[in-house]
Amino acid sequence: MQLNLVVTEAERERLVRLSPTPETGPLLRTLLRLRHDFVIIGRAAASPLPQALQARLEPHSDVGTAIAEFLRASGAALLARRRPPGLDGVESALHSYAAAIDTVRQEGLTRCLPNDVTERFFALCFALEQLRHNLRDLQGCVAEWATSPRQTSDS
């Protein structure tokens, strides 16, 4: 895996003080957890949900956009050694989506679904919650890599 090679080289440079950077392990572990989150989300979303559920969740589909924007801004912050972007957009989108999921559950719309669809629905719910946690960890890693606590992000 190319990421492991890059991390190994970065850690080697850090240890001999050629690069005054934080330890690479936490960032690597966070990126791997995020990768696993996206694999689970991809598997859960591989087949479309029934139309009734899609119609209820569609107004809250800005979750992907908010996460993509946060990841792009985090990558830019890492490269520039700036403070991490805020998570407000992600948190707001995930909160809205979670509220829609709670409403779907309270109304019993998942009770009549086939088992495989129900499993994918709840796997997606779980994966999004894990993703929220791991994005917070990424934000912390980006903060560690920032060169100055006085610098702030544009987000």
Where are the language model's segments positioned?
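Soluble C-terminal extramembrane regulatory/interaction domains of multi-pass membrane proteins
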Residues: 30-153
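Non-transmembrane accessory domains of multi-pass membrane transporters/channels
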Residues: 1-31, 71-87
